[in-house]
Swiss-Prot record:
Induction: By cytokinin and gibberellin. Disruption phenotype: Reduced trichome production on cauline leaves, stem branches and sepals. GO terms for molecular function: DNA-binding transcription factor activity; zinc ion binding. Keywords: Cytokinin signaling pathway, Developmental protein, Differentiation, Gibberellin signaling pathway, Metal-binding, Nucleus, Transcription, Transcription regulation, Zinc, Zinc-finger. InterPro entries: GIS/GIS2/ZFP8, Znf_C2H2_sf, Znf_C2H2_type. Pfam families: zf-C2H2_6. This is Zinc finger protein GIS2. A zinc finger (C2H2-type) spans 55-77. The lineage of its organism: Eukaryota, Viridiplantae, Streptophyta, Embryophyta, Tracheophyta. It comes from Arabidopsis thaliana. Its main location: nucleus. One of its GO terms (cellular component) is nucleus. Expressed in inflorescence meristems, floral meristems and stem epidermis.
Amino acid sequence: MKTYDFMNVNSFSPKERPIRLFGFEFGASHEESESKDNYNENNESIKDDNKEKRFKCHYCFRNFPTSQALGGHQNAHKRERQQTKRFNLHSNAAAFFHRQQNHIAASRLYEDRYSLEAVQINDARLGLCRMYNSSASFNRDRSSYYNRYIPWFIGDHQTRPTYVGGGSSSHGLFYESKKNVPDHVSLDLRL
C-alpha cells in the first residue's frame, strides 16, 4: 500500500500524461506513435458509427443526420396534428350546431328513413315545441310510436305530432303548439 502526501498534489497525480490537441497526443515519446495509430483506428470507427447513426421520423420515415434536425421535423408533425385536431373539433361543433338549427327552424319538410323530425316554429312559441326522441320505432304504414319525448320545460305536457301531406311517399311531421299562448310576446327586459 502506497502512502500519499495529501498536501502535495503531485504525490497522487499520474506521472506524465500526454496532452491531446485536435486528436493528436503530445508529450510522450514512444507512446506518441502508438496513440496516432489508436487515434486513426478510433477515428475510423467513429466515422462508421456516424454513417450508421441515422435518426428516423416515426411519422413519414425520413432519415435525418442529427437528432436536432429530427426534433424540429417532429415538431412540424406535432403542429400539423394539432391543427387537424382543432379543425375537426371546430367542424364537428359547426356541424352539430347546423344540424340543431335545421331541426329547430326547418322551413320545409324533412324526412329520412331513420327519423321524421321537422319543426315549424313561430318566434313567439320557440320554447314551447316538443322534440321527440329520434330513435322512434315505425309501423308498416310508416306511422311511429312517440311514447318517449324530451320536454324543454319541466312540467310540460306531451303534445301529439300532426302529420302534414297526403301522399304515402312523403309524410311531414310538425309539432302542435299550445293553444293558450299569445301570438306576440314582448322581448323587452324590464325590472
